[in-house]
Amino acid sequence: MRPSAIARFSSRRVERTACLAAGVFLLASGFIASALAQSAQQSQPDSGQNSQNSAQNPAQTPQKPAPVTTTVIVHGEVEDNYLPESITVGTLGGVPLKDAPLSASVMTRDLMSDQVSRLLSDVVKNDASVDDDYVPVGYYGVYEIRGFPIDLATGLEVNGLPIAGEQDVPLENKEAVEILKGIASVESGVANAGGLIDYVTKRPANIHAVDLATDQRGTAFGAADFGQLFGSQKQVGARFNLAGERIVPYMNSTNGWRAVGAGAADWKLSPKAVLRGDFEYQHKTERDGSGYQLLGGTTLPDINHIYRSTMLGDQPWGPPDTYDTFNTSARFNYALSPNWTAFAAAGLSHSLIQDNVLYVYGCYYEAECNSGAAPPYFFAPDGTYDIYDYRDPGELRIDGQAEAMLSGHIRTGVITQDVTAGGVLFLRTVHQPGAPPGDAPSTVQDGAVYSYVGSANIYQPIAALPPPGDPDSLEYPLQSAGPRALWEDDHQASAVIEDRVRIPGRIQLIAGGRYDSLRDHNYSLTATSPSTPPKISDKNPWLPQYAVTFDPKRSLTLYANYGVLLSLGPEGPFWVDNSSQFLAPFFTRQAEIGAKYEPSGRILLTTALFHMRAPFFYPKVIEAPDSFCPESVFVAPGDLCFQQEGRETHNGIELNAAGKAANWLRLNASATAMSAMSTDTGTPAFDNRQVINVPRLHSNVFADLTVPGVRGLHLMPGWSYTSRKEATRDDAVSVPSYNLLNLGARYTPGGEQGRVTFHIYANNVTNKKYWSDTGASYGDTFIWLGAPATVRLDAHYSF
């Protein structure tokens, strides 16, 4: 947790854009249809375009869809395109992606390899509905889907089980990354709206491969992928992934390194029973950089006079962050009969962080800000900012989940039903530094260390500051954090049920829901002020989810869905009267209609129209005590109080194309046009305004083009466009729109069946300088410079 979130230590014309996006999509669809027609006229079978993934897994054959799952899962082979040929994605029972009544995208292993992806931020850029929210260099990221930040407690999964999202999940052992866009109340229970991101691990196969990679800055990467199938019927398999990396980012002084170890095992105990297990561990150490803030809360820094390579507040004595994380799970599938199956699964996720950063924030120690002439929670008007020694040792977050499901197929005349029911138990705990004991020395702080050590200016060189503990330092004597204490204890017990009814006329009706018994104990205030009682959220909501699908023909699916989701209330920032207090849980509702078209079995075209509504939260100027800031916390008229008032409504259209458009073209394209408006907020300046950090239009295209006449050579151009993003709630300040061009190539000497494959991929080839994001974190807003041109090289060898 970063200090801006911590109160106690002292101190965020859709019609035209939709038409434009639709026009782009129609043009792309026309081009794809033309390419498909040309491909269909060719008499030769497509035998020379096997993907890298197929070369890596010669003995692996497409598997049957996994049985019932409580989360949206995608499993299967990737053969010759960016769309898995055999996949399951759905509500509780799992259905083919084309038939699923929801909006989802899949980033395959081929796509990740072609783009030389290392982090989730490299992957999610392929979906226009996903944006960065708070993603510092060297720190784990927070992302938003459809304009809503994901919940790090439950919004990230591995093989359908939630993990502690405060980590950079390694990609070396991942077969795919799936993104579910929109509400998934049956799957996720109590969480934030927007969607889920799920990592699918590689399964055992006969494979022996190594990778070596670098970039123009000197990053060094190596990985090994070893797998083997055993037994007369190959009923037992194991796979191991090892990786190490010396990390050299574009920002000075943020170098680091990481090591990864992962294993997976499958055991077919009998024709009816299968046991699967996974484990992954990563150790990472790296310094991270802070983002910029608006000058005086009203002005963007002059982008022509700042540098992407500058680490704000950099000092040679600044320690790095250290991460030790593991995720493990097991799953047992059993076929009770030809029509009935059951499974049980359990997972545990552990994230331990030694959080150390030279944190750059606000201008509390500048005269202009202290006088009230400028808000102290932004940079000063002249670009001056405060530097804090922030140390939060022993941040420990644990997620655990166990679930069991029973699924059956029932036929009654012309009506068939797929019924699924089961239960889920979820636990999350958070430990961080708390209040010192009564006999502790005065150097032990209440919670994390958050000490002012000096100031600097974004337009000037950073002066050297004495390290904490030095007699000349503003932090003398050296401070230490309080002992680790329990901050959050979240228990959920859920009963889930779903019935998918197929009736004549190619119509399917789906009704389901999740009864969730939530008991969330938040001790964040108690941990640092023991006399303060914990914040307890005790809810027992019924979270319904309904859908209908209609298939006019085999290749086309039309659908509609409706769902409700419960989320825990946000925490007030430290500079409001009700600082660090959590607001009440709230509901988000969604209605969505969509269409999916798969004309050839090799490419999927989808579109979705969605409407989502949630409460609006913001710091409001108040003149007298109210229900959010009663007499006990109200300080003075004109103060700010963090409140829930009004609502934000997100309406949008999503367009996607993924797969193989022709023998010479693989494609992954996405466009999202969205209006995310705040209304009835009680502050007229904030009404009918676009929500912070949500672009009205976002699009991207990535293509893999076979070069004629050069066997094994492919060119991979890419382009993305992001419209302007608002940086203030009144939309008075925004960052400009930008285009980015990417370019890559893949070469396999001797053709696609060769053992060696070389990749080169360059992001932002024009080295464009731009503001990428304006995300809000715990009520504070930050602006981030986009990354400069980065060229990555990778060599893959199979043996």
Positions of the model-derived regions?
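Membrane-embedded beta-barrel scaffold of Gram-negative outer-membrane proteins
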Residues: 335, 341-347, 351-357, 551, ...
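Conserved C-terminal beta-signal and adjacent last beta-strands/turns
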Residues: 23, 395, 407, 419, ...
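Acidic, small-polar-rich N-terminal luminal/periplasmic segments of exported/outer-membrane proteins
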Residues: 69-207, 593
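Structural signature of Gram-negative outer-membrane beta-barrels, strongest in the C-terminal barrel
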Residues: 266-268, 397, 416-428, 435, ...
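Acidic/polar loop-and-plug regions of large Gram-negative outer-membrane beta-barrel proteins
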Residues: 245-249, 262-268, 272-335, 339, ...
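Outer-membrane beta-barrel translocator/receptor signature
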Residues: 173-175, 186-263, 267-274, 603
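Gram-negative outer-membrane beta-barrel transporters
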Residues: 504-509, 611-613, 639-728, 796-798
